[in-house]
Each structure stands twice: as C-alpha cells, then as structure tokens.
Amino acid sequence: MDNLKEFIKICHYLYDRKYVVGSGGNVSIKKDNLIYVTPTDSLLGFINEEDIAVVDMDGNIIKGAPTSELYMHLNIYKKRNGVNAIVHTHSLYSTALPMADKEIKLLTPESRIFLKKIGYVDYFEARSMELANEVSKKDEDVIVLKNHGIVCVGKNLMDAYLKTEVMEEISQLNYIIHSL
C-alpha cells in the first residue's frame, strides 16, 4: 500500500516533535474497509512498515498486534463518514492546559480555519470502552481527552497530522497567554 510510507513518516514526525513519548499515542488510516494501525506498545519513532497492524472494521485481526486503543479508532470510523485517518497523541501543551482546567482558545486565523472547534471528553481510563464510546460521540475533528491527550481526525493522514500540529501550536500560545 502506497500510503504506508507516509504513515511511517508521520509516526516518526510525531515522535521527533515529542507529540508522543515512549509507547504513548497511536495512528491509523482506513482503506477499503481495512484499518492500518500502529502496533500496541510501540515507539512510533522507530516503527517500520512491517510493524503496522491490520484489522477489519469489526476488529478482526488480519496482521500484527494493534494498538490497545483500537476500539476508539474503530468507533470513530464507524460513526464518522469521511474520516479516513486518526492521530492520537499525548502532546504536552494540548494535554497540560485542560489538566489545569484552562480552555484552549482558537486565537489565530490558522487555528480557526483548520480546527474550527475543539471537542472535549471527560476523563475515562485509557484503553477503555467508555473512552472509545465517548470519543466517537463527538463530531469535532479535534478532541481533547481530559488528563490523557488529543485525538485528531481527517479525510487523510496529512489532514489529521496538520490538525495535530496546529492544535499543539495553539495550545502553546494559550499557555503563554495564561502565563502573562
């Protein structure tokens, strides 16, 4: 699949920019009713094409060991037409501000254009069906998971990645403003 090279590149970008650390975060794309997803407990900065897990839309494993957040990905794909990629990170500022009960405001033209509106989900245990169900109820393309991280969805992987970058930048700006 041609998109796997881009998939790996995006995973490495996320790791290099510290949007994910350790084995946190995960990425997936949907193609022809198959989900290509990062493996469980993987370091995104070091994965290669052979590591990518593949599942069908019912969660049946075709190849590899998918992320423990698989059901969050599956639920989003099932409920959101037009979503073909998901990026879930534990980006520092995007995670920290909501922990301190600070709102992340869309302060720049770029953030208003690309993010439009931010969704929020209360804290649910990571890897839980409750979290998967709550996230999939949201219709925003950027969703803050309280005390956990963010989920960005897009029509393709570059779109979801762009939203991740813009979200972290606007979160950094919000942090600076809250600090003044």
Curated annotation (Swiss-Prot):
<dbReference type="Pfam" id="PF00596">
    <property type="entry name" value="Aldolase_II"/>
</dbReference>
<dbReference type="GO" id="GO:0005829">
    <property type="term" value="C:cytosol"/>
</dbReference>
<dbReference type="InterPro" id="IPR036409">
    <property type="entry name" value="Aldolase_II/adducin_N_sf"/>
</dbReference>
<dbReference type="InterPro" id="IPR001303">
    <property type="entry name" value="Aldolase_II/adducin_N"/>
</dbReference>
<comment type="pathway">
    <text>Cofactor biosynthesis; coenzyme F420 biosynthesis.</text>
</comment>
<dbReference type="InterPro" id="IPR050197">
    <property type="entry name" value="Aldolase_class_II_sugar_metab"/>
</dbReference>
<feature type="binding site">
    <location>
        <position position="88"/>
    </location>
    <ligand>
        <name>Zn(2+)</name>
    </ligand>
</feature>
<feature type="binding site">
    <location>
        <begin position="67"/>
        <end position="68"/>
    </location>
    <ligand>
        <name>substrate</name>
    </ligand>
</feature>
<dbReference type="GO" id="GO:0019323">
    <property type="term" value="P:pentose catabolic process"/>
</dbReference>
<feature type="binding site">
    <location>
        <position position="90"/>
    </location>
    <ligand>
        <name>Zn(2+)</name>
    </ligand>
</feature>
<comment type="similarity">
    <text>Belongs to the aldolase class II family. AraD/FucA subfamily.</text>
</comment>
<feature type="binding site">
    <location>
        <position position="148"/>
    </location>
    <ligand>
        <name>Zn(2+)</name>
    </ligand>
</feature>
<keyword id="KW-0862">Zinc</keyword>
<comment type="function">
    <text>Involved in the biosynthesis of the coenzyme F420 which requires phospholactate produced via the aldol cleavage of L-fuculose 1-phosphate and the NAD(+)-dependent oxidation of (S)-lactaldehyde. Catalyzes the reversible cleavage of L-fuculose 1-phosphate (Fuc1P) to yield dihydroxyacetone phosphate (DHAP) and S-lactaldehyde.</text>
</comment>
<keyword id="KW-0479">Metal-binding</keyword>
<feature type="binding site">
    <location>
        <begin position="25"/>
        <end position="26"/>
    </location>
    <ligand>
        <name>substrate</name>
    </ligand>
</feature>
<keyword id="KW-0456">Lyase</keyword>
<feature type="binding site">
    <location>
        <position position="69"/>
    </location>
    <ligand>
        <name>Zn(2+)</name>
    </ligand>
</feature>
<dbReference type="InterPro" id="IPR053406">
    <property type="entry name" value="Fuculose-P_aldolase"/>
</dbReference>
<feature type="active site" description="Proton donor/acceptor">
    <location>
        <position position="69"/>
    </location>
</feature>
<dbReference type="GO" id="GO:0008270">
    <property type="term" value="F:zinc ion binding"/>
</dbReference>
<protein>
    <recommendedName>
        <fullName>L-fuculose phosphate aldolase</fullName>
        <ecNumber>4.1.2.17</ecNumber>
    </recommendedName>
</protein>
<dbReference type="GO" id="GO:0008738">
    <property type="term" value="F:L-fuculose-phosphate aldolase activity"/>
</dbReference>
<comment type="subunit">
    <text>Homotetramer.</text>
</comment>
<feature type="binding site">
    <location>
        <begin position="40"/>
        <end position="41"/>
    </location>
    <ligand>
        <name>substrate</name>
    </ligand>
</feature>
